[in-house]
Design a protein with these regions (language model features):
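An acidic intrinsically disordered interaction segment
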Residues: 1-19, 167-184, 270
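Low-complexity, acidic/Ser/Thr- and charged residue-rich accessory regions of DNA metabolism proteins
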Residues: 2-53, 70-71, 474, 508-509, ...
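Mid-to-C-terminal polyanion-binding domains and interfaces
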Residues: 10, 84-88, 326-370, 415, ...
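Hydrophobic helix-and-loop "lid/oligomerization" segment in the mid-to-C-terminal part
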Residues: 20-24, 29-146, 169-170, 221-445
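A residue-level signal for conserved active-site and pocket-lining positions in enzyme catalytic cores
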Residues: 44, 151, 304, 488, ...
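Conserved strand-to-helix beginnings and helix N-cap segments that scaffold or border functional pockets
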Residues: 106-107, 135-136, 163, 185, ...
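Conserved beta-strand positions in the Rossmann-like core of class I SAM-dependent methyltransferases
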Residues: 121, 174, 549
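Conserved phosphate-handling catalytic cores of large alpha/beta enzymes
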Residues: 142-148, 152, 156-249, 421
Length: 585
């Protein structure tokens, strides 16, 4: 159904509509063997599904689809050392991070170790005072308190100095991390990272909590296999689903199992902390099942607010306390911190937008580097994402604090941001990250040199091209049915790597006058085919564009759209959400 010869560019927005190069023969074979509608088979083929068995795993993810934790390099050695620490009642320190991934990883591993009888302490670093990564000073204090085993979660793979400090202090170090390793690895007893050279673990895109979960899974299954699989792991997946969605790892492979089973388990939030957090986020899974969107935009920001605006250890307490009143207090605090974060973000974004519009240098830059005094260091990552959304180019936002500059960067598809900053690594005090996101610090006087060198790198690696929108398939409006929508729902949970499908319909006519909704929005009635039914198509923030296009009853357009279900008791049913639209012809 991905027809060739279709219009590729929206002339009104200069936005290219890009369709994947689907193997139609393979999709047809998959549709027949798995009993799928052809368009669903096409969507699955785009996601790497090749057989009926793989289609069943994708469409019906279950707990038994979890991978063997011992397939991860180093797992046997890690389990042996942790079991010895538990048996000997050694004090174990879990060293995490301050974001959703890092704090939930602490909760998962701490809960597992304490279930097994371990003596556990944890450290969630303060974003402003300590920054990202393990610090030698913290390890020194831990050793003085009797710690003999340190397990890092969502951090450690590039913490060479801290690893050396651990060795000098006589601490055994197990690094569990998902960030891309350097060519060299830190000195540690064991490293668990699916991305390290020689590791054959099938799912390379686990989040940090995912790696910590695999260690917990191996330990718990060795303790009581039946109980672990029947009760413990499903419960753990509630927390892991939040981390997996929040860290924007691809929702494919084992991550899809984490997210899908975890969302199902979240229908019954047993812990006081989860119940309280859902309450302040105004989510009731008893009335409506949670979605990945709920986790990404309603739950994760409140958890992240603790590390951005205050202390991340509040998150660990929230999810481990059994005191309902205390859980309510902590959830209310996270909700308040999230509101403060939103206000600070809006004020900083206004400054950035003004500078981007006033300074012509930014318009010509292939990579945006923008810095400011007094910017809140806990919010610069969000702001970098906002700049990427606006400029469609890699962006680094830097907060200047005295003589030190703290930065966060986000990228665009095809531009490996970590490789870019590795090309000028001598400028940094510290740095790390992924292909699409980085964090770093450097002396203020080196910011201009960083800007110059990143611009030179970007000139070679960022293509000048019209902004593009990935569409997934051609779906004429007269082929939409309730049955097809039911099949499409099985693609959930949706997210990175398994995006909500955007369909294209060509030569669609408006069957009624444009109906405005609250000034900024519109509702169009669209139909296709000689006897095609008319569909409501909602255009959020489309009022000005529809007016500029001069659309009226009888106009013929090409439309890129998402398929939605309106749950309104009186006006419910399927409807379209406009992603883009262009006049036909």
């Amino acid at each position: 159904m991905n027809a060739a010869g279709s219009p590729a560019v929206n002339a009104q927005t200069a936005q290219r509509w890009v369709l994947p190069q689907t193997n139609s023969t393979a999709a047809s074979i998959l549709a027949k063997s798995a009993g799928l509608p052809l368009i669903v088979a096409e969507l699955l083929a785009e996601r790497g599904v090749r057989s009926a068995a793989e289609a069943d795993v994708f469409l019906h993810p279950r707990l038994e689809h979890l991978l063997d934790p011992y397939a991860m390099q180093g797992m046997a050695a890690a389990v042996t050392r942790v079991q010895a620490a538990i048996a000997g009642q050694e004090l174990i320190l879990i060293y995490g991070d301050y974001d959703v991934d890092g704090t939930t990883a602490i909760v998962l591993l701490k809960t597992a170790l304490e279930m097994l009888g371990g003596k556990v302490d944890f450290h969630a670093p303060h974003r402003l005072r300590e920054g990202y990564g393990m610090q030698a000073e913290v390890l020194t204090a831990a050793a003085a308190q009797g710690v003999r085993l340190v397990i890092s979660v969502d951090t450690g793979i590039r913490d060479f100095a801290a690893a050396e400090a651990a060795a000098r202090l006589g601490l055994d170090l197990i690094v569990t991390d998902h960030h891309l390793p350097h060519a060299d690895l830190p000195h540690a007893l064991v490293i668990l990272n699916p991305n390290q050279t020689g590791c054959g673990y099938a799912c390379k895109h686990l989040c940090g909590a995912g790696v910590a979960f695999k260690l917990a899974q191996a330990l718990l299954e060795a303790w009581d296999l039946d109980r672990t699989r029947a009760k413990v792991l499903p419960s753990f997946l509630k927390m892991l689903a939040i981390a997996t969605v929040a860290d924007a790892v691809p929702l494919l492979g084992e991550n899809r199992v984490f997210a899908s089973v975890g969302l199902e388990q979240l229908r019954r939030p047993a812990s006081a902390g989860l119940r309280s957090l859902l309450q302040v986020a105004k989510l009731d899974p008893a009335r409506r099942p949670l979605t990945a969107t709920d986790l990404a935009f309603r739950i994760a920001p409140r958890i992240n607010a603790a590390g951005r605006m205050d202390v991340a250890s509040d998150v660990v307490e929230l999810f481990t306390t059994r005191d309902a009143a205390r859980a309510g207090e902590l959830a209310a605090k996270l909700d308040r911190l999230n509101s403060e974060r939103q206000q600070a973000e809006a004020a900083m974004l206004e400054q950035i937008d003004r500078r981007l519009g006033e300074d012509p240098v930014f318009a010509a830059s292939r990579c945006i580097v923008i810095e400011g005094d007094g910017w809140h260091r806990g919010i610069i990552g969000i702001l970098a994402s906002r700049v990427v959304d606006r400029m469609r180019r890699p962006a680094l936002v830097i907060a200047l604090e005295g003589g030190e500059a703290y930065g966060s960067g986000r990228s665009v598809p095809g531009f490996h941001l970590l490789h870019a900053i590795e090309g000028c690594k001598e400028l940094f005090t510290r740095f790390g990250g992924h292909s699409h996101a980085v964090g770093f610090s450097l002396p203020v006087e080196r910011v201009d040199e960083l800007r110059r060198r990143l611009q030179a790198w970007a000139e070679l690696h960022v293509e000048e091209a019209a902004p593009s929108m990935l569409c997934h398939a051609v779906l004429p409006l007269d082929q939409i049915t309730e049955a097809l929508f039911s099949w499409l729902r099985r693609l959930e949970p949706l997210g990175n790597g398994n995006e909500e499908p955007i369909f294209i319909a060509y030569n669609v006519r408006l069957t009624a006058p444009v109906r405005p909704i609250k000034d900024r929005h519109v509702c169009l009635q669209l139909a296709q085919g000689a006897r095609g039914a008319s569909w409501s198509a909602l255009g959020w923030d489309w009022a000005a564009r529809v007016q500029a296009l001069g659309l009226q009853q009888g106009s013929v357009v090409h439309v890129a759209y998402k398929l939605r279900e309106n749950a309104h008791p009186e006006f419910g049913g399927l409807e379209l959400e406009i992603a883009d639209l262009v006049i036909a012809g």
